[in-house]
Curated annotation (Swiss-Prot):
Pumilio repeats lie at residues 99-134, 135-170, 206-243, 291-326, 340-377, 379-415, 531-568, 575-613. Keywords: Nucleus, Repeat, Ribosome biogenesis, rRNA processing. One of its GO terms (cellular component) is nucleolus. This is Nucleolar protein 9. PANTHER family: NUCLEOLAR PROTEIN 9. Its main location: nucleus. GO terms for molecular function: RNA binding. It is found in: Nucleus, Nucleolus. Residues 706-715 have a biased composition (Basic residues). The lineage of its organism: Eukaryota, Fungi, Dikarya, Ascomycota, Saccharomycotina. The gene is NOP9. Residues 13-24, 688-698 have a biased composition (Basic and acidic residues). Residues 1-52, 688-715 are annotated as: Disordered. One of its GO terms (biological process) is endonucleolytic cleavage in ITS1 to separate SSU-rRNA from 5.8S rRNA and LSU-rRNA from tricistronic rRNA transcript (SSU-rRNA, 5.8S rRNA, LSU-rRNA).
Length: 715
């Protein structure tokens, strides 16, 4: 690694730099001292972890220990948010910003103080935000390439986009307290009078020479992503969401650990001035002009550059109808199969980074549909099943294609996969469960295409011993074990373990199965009956598995009719909760289950009465609980205790609404007994005969004599 330039840096950090050359490329920034990035370093990096960059680490200045203690305490205070009012917090922020005046650059490049700067950016007023942005002018290329300041810069850019929109729609108003406090400061007045758009354009001018290298830089590439989203007017997603394009996986985890939360400026798109369209064209041109097909394809499979290239393909249609970047990577839509392109697509389908790239360009709206259809037709259509077996790469492409292709092609994919679905899903290795969910969604979108065969395949995989046509009570818990894997889960742990992402994924899949077909609901009932009651209650109190129980509390619609066998199983399933209603009602997760029991006990008034009686027996304790009070209210327990007749009227109304759900009234939808149908037929026939005889009698009387004028009561 080349040494930083400048006598000050060399003298202050001579020993540290010499050590860092042998150990770590970023060691200059290790001990809380922070670094800027030089703007004029043309020598290539020797480390494998960096691209050839124009920047090497340069020192801004040390933050002394007293300052670090002050700013660290300020960051903790803002994080705790113990202010009595918004005015108190605003005053505290003003004092911290005043203390940091002139020190912004060394604070933002300090590991500890950069967290404070990011909080200040999130909480600053519009005028304060402009001041921070102005302090960074002239240093944006350096800050974008720095490990710590790049994160602050990302947040600053999102807030700047919101401020630019305010200026466009004339909603920008200066904070009166800030204006009065700095009224005599010429610099602040100048900054306040400068538009955010003009400062943003100055930043883009400073970054313009570096676009082609930023795309491959570990930190600057994230800043570049946000800039592309802003100038194209696209939505700026949350920086903490799992699938966010703004942050790396490590950054999202770190933000959650230090409890930095996004404000209302995230998760939305903003109006942008017309000048931004030209800047978008400049960025795309700067990236694509030095590239040929070989280098463009290498960027597509580059770990750092690939996400940026995905964004460029997504937005290039705004300024380039010819889609030049797309055609650098792939051939035109009319081109036949090409051996070089075929080899590249095969690599995309086999490589983790490449498959992410191909999945993203299929899912987003940037690439034209005819481009996607050509790639599918030439290189994927004949081997759909083979690609679906690639559990870490190709299967995600198939899932993306199910969302985008025309109905005929979707049905072709379903024809290939559904007969082999049970062999594609691996329970032990947790593979292709999401494929099952995607196939269900695709089947629903095609009017339940091959529904029965799909259900058969799913049962064959997850409950091979279950008899769908004749469910019996001797069913085992195989569905739970195969889908949820309860034996190796956090269920029943006493260490307050958080549910894992894998448990959430599996629970959502089982919920999807229950939504798809009612036979899975009945199977879940029987699996619950096969569990020890203690284990079932643990599921009800679990942060994830409680949702499975909750989704199992559904009754067949009146239009379909509930078979007697299913009604009996529903009663037996309800018996599992007997004696546990109080515990469930007072639990944060179990209370939702008790709420669902109100609808689940429709047409079973005795069970509904029994549940309400259990709560009434523990009335004081239920009402002392936050969650219990909500359940008490949702079950209208005050009526049950004081006016039970009115409570029973509610129960009757629920039954009427259940039968009227298809738009008919009362008992019209109710399935009648044979004797009731016969009596109704006799009554209608008799009524018709009486009306006909009455009409014939009136006609006869009218033809033989005049109608007599009624008098008195008979009038």
């Amino acid at each position: 690694m080349p040494k930083p330039r400048g006598r000050r840096v060399q003298s202050a950090f001579k020993e540290r730099v010499e050590n860092s050359e042998a150990t770590h490329e970023n060691s200059i920034a290790e001990t809380g001292s922070d670094v800027e990035i030089s703007l004029h370093e043309d020598q290539p990096q020797t480390s494998d972890n960096k691209n050839q960059g124009e920047f090497s680490s340069v020192f801004y200045g040390l933050v002394d220990s007293a300052e670090i203690d002050y700013f660290k305490q300020a960051e903790s205070t803002l994080n705790a948010n113990v202010f009595e009012s918004d005015e108190d917090r605003a005053g505290f922020i003003r004092s911290v910003l005043e203390e940091s005046r002139g020190k912004e650059l060394k604070l933002v490049t300090n590991q500890i103080c950069s967290k404070l700067m990011e909080r200040l950016v999130l909480l600053a007023s519009d005028r304060q935000l402009k001041h921070i942005f102005h302090q960074f002018l002239g240093h944006f290329p350096a800050l974008a390439h720095h490990k710590y300041s790049s994160h602050v810069l990302e947040t600053l850019l999102v807030r700047s986009a919101a401020l630019i929109e305010k200026e466009i729609v004339n909603e920008y108003q200066q904070d009166e307290e800030d204006q009065d406090e700095n009224a005599d400061n010429d610099e602040d007045n100048f900054v306040a009078s400068t538009t955010m758009e003009s400062m943003f354009l100055q930043m883009l001018d400073q970054l313009e020479p570096y676009w082609s290298s930023m795309i491959q830089h570990q930190y600057a590439s994230h800043v570049m992503r946000i800039i592309i989203l802003i100038v194209s007017g696209k939505e700026l997603p949350s920086s903490t969401m799992a699938n966010s394009v703004l942050r790396s996986k490590k950054s999202k985890v770190a933000r959650k650990m230090i409890e930095i939360k996004d404000n209302e400026d995230f998760n939305r798109a903003y109006q942008v001035p017309s000048s931004f369209k030209d800047r978008l064209r400049t960025i795309i041109s700067a990236v694509s002009s030095p590239l040929d097909t070989k280098s463009a394809r290498s960027l597509a499979i580059h770990k750092v550059a690939s996400p940026v290239l995905q964004l460029i393909i997504r937005v290039e249609g705004i300024v380039d109808k010819e889609r030049s970047v797309w055609h650098l990577i792939f051939l035109s839509e009319k081109a036949p199969k090409d051996s070089s392109e075929e080899a590249f697509v095969e690599y995309l389908l086999s490589d983790s980074v490449g498959s992410h790239f191909l999945e993203a360009i299929i899912k987003n709206d940037g690439a034209r549909m005819k481009y996607i259809e050509r790639l599918y037709r030439l290189y994927m259509k004949d081997r759909v099943l083979k690609l679906a077996r690639r559990a870490t790469t190709g299967v995600y492409i198939i899932q993306a294609l199910l969302l985008k292709l025309k109905p005929g092609e979707v049905e072709h994919i379903l024809d290939e996969i559904i007969p082999e679905l049970s062999s594609l899903i691996s329970i032990s290795e947790s593979q292709n469960i999401d494929l099952g969910k995607a196939i269900i969604d695709a089947s629903i979108s095609r009017f339940n295409y091959r529904r029965d065969e799909l259900i058969e395949q799913l049962f064959q995989k997850f409950a091979p011993n279950y008899n769908v046509s004749d469910p019996s009570e001797d069913t085992t818990t195989e569905l739970f074990e195969n889908v949820l894997q309860l034996a190796s889960s956090t269920l029943g742990n006493t260490r307050d373990d958080w549910p894992t992402a894998e448990e959430r994924r599996r629970s959502l899949f089982l919920e999807k199965l229950m939504q798809y077909d009612y036979s899975f609901v009945v199977c879940v009932w029987l699996n619950c009956m096969a569990l020890p009651q203690e284990r079932l209650m643990q599921m009800c109190f679990h942060g994830v598995f409680s949702h499975v129980i909750e989704h199992a509390l559904v009754v067949k619609p009146a239009s379909e009719g509930e078979p007697k066998e299913v009604l009996i199983l529903r009663k037996k399933f309800l018996n599992l909760f007997q004696g546990k209603i109080f515990e469930l009602a007072c639990n944060s997760y179990g209370s939702h289950i008790v709420d669902k029991l109100w609808d689940f006990t429709v047409l079973l008034p005795m069970y509904k009465d029994r549940i309400a009686s259990e709560m009434m027996a523990q009335a004081n304790r239920v009402k002392d609980s936050t969650y219990g009070r909500l359940v008490w209210k949702n079950w209208s327990m005050e009526l049950f205790v004081r006016k039970k007749y009115d409570w029973k009227v509610l129960v009757k109304e629920q039954e009427e609404n259940y039968y009227a759900e298809e738009g008919t009234q009362g008992d019209a939808m109710k399935k009648k007994k044979p004797i009731e149908l016969k009596m109704e037929e006799i009554f209608k026939k008799k009524q018709y005969q009486e009306e006909r005889a009455k009409r014939e009698g009136e006609d006869l009387a009218g033809s033989n004599q005049k109608r007599m004028k009624g008098r008195g009561r008979n009038r």
